[in-house]
């Protein structure tokens, strides 16, 4: 199971939001590139980047910083937030990004996502952000009626590289990852699932490890790393010991 540190970008800074609320922002670093290097030096084998400004604007807002991070870390990087057209995907892949995460578009513009999967096989990740099981879009500001499970199943056999399942109600709250919701999703689809949202302690990772066989391939950790509740080296060691 791969441990993936999260770097959320807003206004050129590394931040964390509480439950996706743009009014509840904590700035953890004014230098996201240095932050990315620090996680790499501590053993990160993959990084999860989110362009929060882009998720609201509908197009990239922190591309220069993302490019610098990709060039400086030397490990695979995934990026989400504001990716709404093929040219943006091409731009990110050209700068060395390994995977693009499509969230809002997965619900609102399926033909675009299908096209992206055809053009860039293995480079598209489905980002499913859910609140009480229902998918949220547009930077989590809009709630839909479709369930996370329904959305994931609808993208089977499309060449999706992975599904990142984020429980918004837990994100940034350090209340513990939604193990059951993630397990149900992983068992329902034949796509690797990455858990996200609410990871608080090493115990969360311990609870996810037995579910690798169910298809949970990784876990994204944000606030718990920045607050010091989890040491990245310990998390990686634990994940590799399984």
UniProtKB/Swiss-Prot annotation:
Its EC number is 5.3.1.16. Keywords: Amino-acid biosynthesis, Cytoplasm, Histidine biosynthesis, Isomerase. It holds the Pfam family His_biosynth. One of its GO terms (cellular component) is cytoplasm. Pathway: Amino-acid biosynthesis; L-histidine biosynthesis; L-histidine from 5-phospho-alpha-D-ribose 1-diphosphate: step 4/9. GO terms for biological process: L-histidine biosynthetic process; L-tryptophan biosynthetic process. It comes from the Bacteria. The active site is at 8 (proton acceptor), 129 (proton donor). GO terms for molecular function: 1-(5-phosphoribosyl)-5-[(5-phosphoribosylamino)methylideneamino]imidazole-4-carboxamide isomerase activity. It is found in: Cytoplasm. InterPro entries: Aldolase_TIM, His_biosynth, HisA_bact_arch, Isoase_HisA-like, Isoase_HisA-like_bact, RibuloseP-bd_barrel. It catalyses: 1-(5-phospho-beta-D-ribosyl)-5-[(5-phospho-beta-D-ribosylamino)methylideneamino]imidazole-4-carboxamide = 5-[(5-phospho-1-deoxy-D-ribulos-1-ylimino)methylamino]-1-(5-phospho-beta-D-ribosyl)imidazole-4-carboxamide. Belongs to the HisA/HisF family. This is 1-(5-phosphoribosyl)-5-[(5-phosphoribosylamino)methylideneamino] imidazole-4-carboxamide isomerase. It comes from Syntrophus aciditrophicus (strain SB). The lineage of its organism: Bacteria, Pseudomonadati, Thermodesulfobacteriota, Syntrophia, Syntrophales.
